[in-house]
Regions:
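Active-site nucleophile-adjacent alpha helix/oxyanion-hole segment immediately C-terminal to the catalytic cysteine
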Residues: 20-219, 223-231, 235-248, 327, ...
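Active-site signature of cysteine proteases
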Residues: 157-371
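Bacterial Sec-dependent N-terminal signal peptides
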Residues: 1-21
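Hydrophobic alpha-helical segments
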Residues: 16-17, 56, 264, 356
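Alpha-helix boundary/interfacial micro-motifs
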Residues: 15, 59, 65, 126-127, ...
Length: 371
């Protein structure tokens, strides 16, 4: 993937933009498709991971493609319903999922370009799944209540019909750039496979350098996470970015330090307000403090995004350039639709990072016994 050179003067000449360029200097930023909006949906996991895969395709020399986030969401909704019913309703159901769910769905169902399946069935140009989500949840709860005392296989067809109506039918074949594909053959052509990727996290309630099932509500599929030391997690993320890789990022964004309007995320010292001018110190984040915030629900699994670069702030610190899925109207003029995330914020609020196994540090890869 070629590096995107950010030329400040060519992007904007406003005073605000000039101020932004004084506060932040680019270190590296990699190609990504334009910022999109997930609308009124809980599909950040699909938007972020699809964006990540789009950058992966550019990096791998496969060209620029706009992948369908809602095609994958539709298929994952099928998997979630099956899981919910098999567990007699004793598990998470809703719109939320994680990055590995998208990758697994690509393995199982394939993937399609957005122009083939955009999931919009009305005249609206934006997604709103509020009605659909309520109906799907009511449906699976009714199935689980099992008033007929014995389930028939018909419930799956009824559930799929709801998805057909609200999102569209599964496209069995399509033409794209002059070639005929099925969703599976398109994924094969793009060489997208779940086992090419790994998800890393860092918590002290599990042994370091082992894999485990992270206990968070959206891990309904019991996905595996690799546990590493906190400093290794930060080093791995920065090194991957500097070597040409991007990262799918799961994090907490519910705290006052995350400000999408300002386009900056910080961890203010306890009792202080976040200073988005970068003129105040941040809290020192340790592994113990991170664990405490996770254990007491201060930090939860809120939102998935896509890390595409690094910048250096006027305070001398490095910030992650994070592509969001809330549209391109928020944030700094130079980074519309993005949030610049401090290292302290990353340490405190990261749930996990998903990246290509080729991006893993050799020593870390050996410790995790990954091939």
């Amino acid at each position: 993937m070629k590096k995107t050179v950010i030329v400040i003067l060519s992007l904007c000449a406003s005073v605000v933009c000039a101020q932004d360029s004084l506060r932040f200097n680019p270190i590296v930023q990699w190609d990504a498709n334009p910022v999109e909006s997930q609308g009124q949906t809980g599909t950040c996991w699909s938007y972020s991971t699809a964006s990540f895969l789009e950058s992966e395709l550019i990096r791998m020399g496969k060209g620029t493609h706009n992948l369908s986030e809602i095609f994958i969401a539709r298929q994952v909704y099928l998997n979630k319903a099956d899981n919910y019913v098999r567990r007699h309703g004793k598990t998470q159901f809703g719109e939320g999922s994680l990055g590995h769910d998208l990758l697994n769905a690509v393995d199982d169902y394939g993937i399609v370009p957005n122009e083939v399946f955009n999931g919009l069935q009305t005249t609206s140009e934006t997604h709103n799944h509020a009605e659909l989500a309520s109906i799907l949840e009511a449906y699976v709860k009714a199935v689980v209540s099992n008033k007929g005392k014995k389930l028939t296989p018909l419930w799956k067809a009824g559930y799929a019909a709801l998805l057909d109506v609200y999102l569209g039918k599964y496209p069995t074949n399509f033409d794209y750039q002059g070639v005929k594909y099925t969703p599976q053959s398109f994924a094969k052509m793009l060489n997208l496979k779940a086992d090419h990727y790994a998800t890393l996290t860092s918590y002290t309630h599990q042994p370091v350098y082992t894999d485990f099932i992270l206990g968070i509500p959206d891990n309904w599929a019991n996905g595996t996470f690799y546990n590493v030391a906190l400093n290794d997690l930060v080093k791995q993320a920065k090194t991957a970015l500097k070597e040409g890789f991007t990262i799918a990022w799961d994090a907490d964004v519910s705290n006052s330090g995350f400000n999408s309007k300002e386009g900056i995320a910080l961890v203010p010292v306890k009792g202080e307000k976040a200073n988005f001018e970068l003129t105040a110190p941040e809290m020192e984040v340790t592994a113990a403090l991170r664990q405490e915030h996770f254990d007491n629900y201060t930090v939860t699994d809120d939102h998935l995004m896509h890390i595409v670069g690094l910048v250096k702030g006027v305070d001398g610190k490095e910030y992650f350039v994070v592509k969001n899925s809330w549209g391109d109207e928020r944030g700094l003029d130079l980074y519309k639709g993005h949030v610049l995330v401090s290292e302290a914020y990353f340490k405190m609020n990261t749930i996990s990072v998903l990246l290509h196994k080729d991006a893993l540090l050799k020593k870390l890869k050996n410790k995790l016994n990954l091939k």
